[in-house]
Amino acid sequence: MNMLLVIAVNTILSLILITVAFWLPQLNIYTEKANPYECGFDPMSSARLPFSMKFFLVAITFLLFDLEIALLLPIPWAIQTPHINMVLPTALILLTILALGLAYEWLQKGLEWTE
């Protein structure tokens, strides 16, 4: 009962906040807010330079494998618990998913910087 109440309250509160954010847009938009700020000077060139999509993909891959380390780091302490039958299969499933993701990234040549 408490779980359903928490889910219902969170859902209703989220819907109210989304509705308020949608129906009350910011009305004082003017061009100075849309321009980049460079120490009080007018920008010499465009501040919105395009970036390399390859760099973006490598950065996302790095973040995913950094998250892997954060998830696998507590495993030596978790092995000492009496619930080892739950810890090891979960860790192996996580490692398998990440290894398959790495293999897919490698086969798609996402890790090669030069082409």
Swiss-Prot record:
Gene Ontology terms, MF aspect: NADH dehydrogenase (ubiquinone) activity
One Pfam family matching this protein: Oxidored_q4
Keyword check for Ribosomal protein: no
Keywords: Electron transport, Membrane, Mitochondrion, Mitochondrion inner membrane, NAD, Respiratory chain, Translocase, Transmembrane, Transmembrane helix, Transport, Ubiquinone
Family in the record: Belongs to the complex I subunit 3 family.
Chain's role: Core subunit of the mitochondrial membrane respiratory chain NADH dehydrogenase (Complex I) which catalyzes electron transfer from NADH through the respiratory chain, using ubiquinone as an electron acceptor. Essential for the catalytic activity of complex I.
Subunit structure: Core subunit of respiratory chain NADH dehydrogenase (Complex I) which is composed of 45 different subunits. Interacts with TMEM186. Interacts with TMEM242.
Protein name as it appears in the record: NADH-ubiquinone oxidoreductase chain 3
